Amino acid sequence: MSLMNWFEDRRKFSGLIGAFIEKATKGYILSERRKDRHIKIDTTKGLWTRCDNCENMLYIRFLRQNKRICEECGYHLQMSSTERIESLIDRGTWHPMDEDMVARDALKFSDEDSYKNRVLFYQKRTGLTDAIQTGIGKLNGIPIALGVMDFQFMGGSMGSVVGEKITRLIEYGTRESMPVIIVCSSGGARMQEGTLSLMQMAKISAVLQIHQAQKKLLYIAILTYPTTGGVTASFGMLGDVIIAEPKAYIAFAGKRVIEQTLRQKIPDGSQVAESLFDHGLLDLIVPRNLLRGVLSEIFELYSSAPCRRSNNS
């Protein structure tokens, strides 16, 4: 039996690995038929990863096919912005915007390293120019304006480039009467840009006011792990529909900061999506593998709303 056939057979009955976790961590998988026979796995090529929640070893190829959802516990691992675009947008319909926009070190900020060098490091590491990708595409045939933040680029922090790209995306969606979707994954405002970063919160909120209130167009915010700081305090919570992934960490300030400031304990789990949903701060909690279908249903409901029919007539 070939290695790939063995994986497919195991996946049908007991997830990716099931038993033999200890051996898998050493790069070996035991055959059920002949346990004295083993196949060595070359871990140097990055074939495996570990679930952040249950610590089960996961085969990366199957994990990608499953949209980075752990097959053992259902935990949603972090996705890159490119993977999210591929999971939401119809094949061959994606047209990126403002790819050449890069950050400038206006404040000449430096701590352990200069801001300029940090940006260059993450550009080489991720292949992105900054912490968001924006563009136009189709979701099940419906044209949308989509922005996807990438936590792998400086923690998804929002600086002048992220703010400007989101602003231009919303303005384009407003001109073309398109719904706007922003997938949030961020640690908040980028401290290396100071006030230039903080002002993006107000700028984005202003263009969303035009898009939503004046033009009566749809804006959907999708909150993923983690969404914190200035992103939560601005466009993350301004959606007509606010969707979160299961167990997503969503907050303005972290638990430790709140406890040190207020000098009192806050409940465990109070900053996860399920708690926020129970308190009315979210509209939906949607697993990643169901998101396309849910978004399509929302678009259908929105297009048939009375205010939309009167505006289009």
Swiss-Prot record:
It catalyses: N(6)-carboxybiotinyl-L-lysyl-[protein] + acetyl-CoA = N(6)-biotinyl-L-lysyl-[protein] + malonyl-CoA. Zn(2+) binds at C51, C54, C70, C73. Its cofactor is Zn(2+). Residues 47-313 form the CoA carboxyltransferase N-terminal domain. GO terms for molecular function: acetyl-CoA carboxylase activity; ATP binding; carboxyl- or carbamoyltransferase activity; zinc ion binding. InterPro entries: AcCoA_carboxyl_beta, Acetyl_CoA_COase_Trfase_b_su, ClpP/crotonase-like_dom_sf, COA_CT_N. Gene3D superfamilies: 2-enoyl-CoA Hydratase, Chain A, domain 1. Its EC number is 2.1.3.15. It comes from the Eukaryota. Belongs to the AccD/PCCB family. Component of the acetyl coenzyme A carboxylase (ACC) complex. Biotin carboxylase (BC) catalyzes the carboxylation of biotin on its carrier protein (BCCP) and then the CO(2) group is transferred by the transcarboxylase to acetyl-CoA to form malonyl-CoA. This is Acetyl-coenzyme A carboxylase carboxyl transferase subunit beta, chloroplastic. It comes from Anthoceros angustus (Hornwort).
